[in-house]
């Protein structure tokens, strides 16, 4: 019986024997694709090839692609652990044809791999296939070409309420490439409930889809018209976990070898004896998605991809808590994961220390609030009415205890309770955007500028070339000519202009000819062509016209200083902070460089100085900057770093600066590092959880920045009547004096507040034996209010005190309750009730709570509501 690792390798070997290029799995973070939250199919990395926007050196490819479906449109998270086949992470085996073979070979390849004794050797009588209802060609190939009996071939029509809306018709989106597909199903046998595809019992587990073969033969336009593609292509996908379950003779994916080893380790770490416990499945699944997301540069955070990762980690930790885990355990699964993933685990192995560290830190952080949050949820669930948990409670768990909604839903599901999601959404307000980042992703591929041919880039050696205009786009539409004053995108056959890529902004300059000038403000890539974006200043410009393309060299030189300095900065960061530093984004312009990178801990000022000194050391070393073109595998073997969000071909350009820095890069650089002159870090900050940003200037920009700082220093010294060398000492003296004065003032305020408290005590009213004071006080800060409340609680014995004060346009509220009453009156609930009247919110302990608001005109309403509530509840 084959292991999962052996099945993965057999698939790749089979298609390699059929002339396919084996292509590595792409990152789970899609490269240059804003339409996807995560890579969720094997074809994602080839999408631009299918769209005609990119080319490869091969026309046949095969992959074992890592995929994540959690968050956004494709979200399996809530079902993971409760079904036999839902996962957050899975591997998609695929073979692809880019205008090479089509239906005949695609079908025969699939059948041979599945049924040949040399490969998987599945019994033919166990296999069924579906085809699109009108796809007679595929039907004929299956029946006549392969020999599948007609009672094992099922036609599936439009079963989703619209033309071409079918389980057997695939589309990339509302527009773009699409076509019929054929699916292969495996029959697990009569002992398993379920019916054939298309039947009422098709959702059962007897007949399981193992392979989907898509025939991309149409391009759907916005009006629904189907155009035939000039080069039909093939995209296939077979879930590795599903086919492993078939080969290993089990009905559930969680019973295959890789999951059984992970489940056994989870059971060992948590002490769980029942190996069928669903929580074991959840954790075994989640370690795979979490580890590989971190490997591909995702950091737990409160937005976008990072928030999805945080949700998955916290769901796993909560299920560990259910199993009885008493200590951090999740990160301890990483070594087992590396082992069970075999060759596919090498990427995790390379970053094992960082993966384990981030998982441990996230688990420790969540553990601080998990038990308190679960206690609150348990209390709320006991009091649930009509089987619905209020959205307000769900939001409090999210906002205060870090419980993602799906984690709360997980707990509720176990007790057959649903969540008032509408109420939760109302409470979320602006914060709802955190978990919904995927909803912003989308594009209409027919609006992409698409031009046949390519632009030859001459910019590495030239700043001016003669070129021909091959296309013009005005207001998004292709035109034959433009006139003075019109802004447009100009496509050339050759160009010295660098198009924005790798964080480096596009070149500026001009296109000139007799009586014609087009000012280029930016340069962008559109597939294989370069677009020169700008405005025609003089004359007319026509398609086919020959022009001179002239780069603004001053702008380019300044940009190149910053780009080369960015490489030195990246190397310095890794040397000072550690090899876990990975680029998360960058901007290289003519005025500044910005570098975002993964770093779980804060960077000290001393570390920033060390990084800055290291960069300047290598600038002074005046290293020769060497560029070479080589196969990507050779570049990686030499240690060249590939950068976040960049797409690389089979042959890459490597930029090396001495022995200090080596990166894959297509940008413009200096010839020697000494040309940079000077490097100065101007800021270092955190921009998200686990992501830091460094901004810096170079050359003349660095000198200007230092001169500006010198001016500020001298002006500050003049204002404080000090010299620059004594400025820190002078500021310290002023701070000490201010603190002393502030302390004296606060003491006077507290003394005054205690006197006021004695006077206020006389105004207390009694409600059923409880002293009650509800008042608005003038000219009081929050500290003074708390002093008065504490003093009154001591004076009055059994009491409830509620104060409101106005400071300019803000409202402050303080509520105090003596401890004997906190079972009946909770300060936090009462202060929130009052705060709602003045447009605010707050919280605190049962005996003392504070809140703020922004509607002072409603103070009287807050006081009235408080009085009414106390009369009703005391």
Swiss-Prot record:
Binding positions (Zn(2+)): 563, 567, 665, 669
GO CC annotations, alphabetized: cytosol
Localization of this protein: Cytoplasm
Lineage: Bacteria, Pseudomonadati, Pseudomonadota, Gammaproteobacteria, Pasteurellales
Keyword vocabulary terms for this entry: Aminoacyl-tRNA synthetase, ATP-binding, Cytoplasm, Ligase, Metal-binding, Nucleotide-binding, Protein biosynthesis, RNA-binding, tRNA-binding, Zinc
Keyword tRNA-binding: yes
Domains (record comment): Consists of three domains; the N-terminal catalytic domain, the editing domain and the C-terminal C-Ala domain. The editing domain removes incorrectly charged amino acids, while the C-Ala domain, along with tRNA(Ala), serves as a bridge to cooperatively bring together the editing and aminoacylation centers thus stimulating deacylation of misacylated tRNAs.
Catalytic reaction annotation: tRNA(Ala) + L-alanine + ATP = L-alanyl-tRNA(Ala) + AMP + diphosphate
Sequence intervals crossing the membrane: none
Cofactor(s) required for function per UniProt: Zn(2+)
UniProt xrefs under Gene3D superfamilies: 2.40.30.130, 3.10.310.40, 3.30.54.20, 6.10.250.550, Bira Bifunctional Protein, Domain 2, Threonyl-trna Synthetase, Chain A, domain 2
Cofactor: how and how many bound: Binds 1 zinc ion per subunit.
Gene Ontology biological process terms from the UniProt entry: alanyl-tRNA aminoacylation; negative regulation of DNA-templated transcription
Disulphides: none
NCBIfam families reported in the protein's UniProt record: alaS
EC number: 6.1.1.7
Full protein name: Alanine--tRNA ligase
Keyword set includes Metal-binding: yes
Role of this protein: Catalyzes the attachment of alanine to tRNA(Ala) in a two-step reaction: alanine is first activated by ATP to form Ala-AMP and then transferred to the acceptor end of tRNA(Ala). Also edits incorrectly charged Ser-tRNA(Ala) and Gly-tRNA(Ala) via its editing domain.
The family this protein is said to belong to: Belongs to the class-II aminoacyl-tRNA synthetase family.
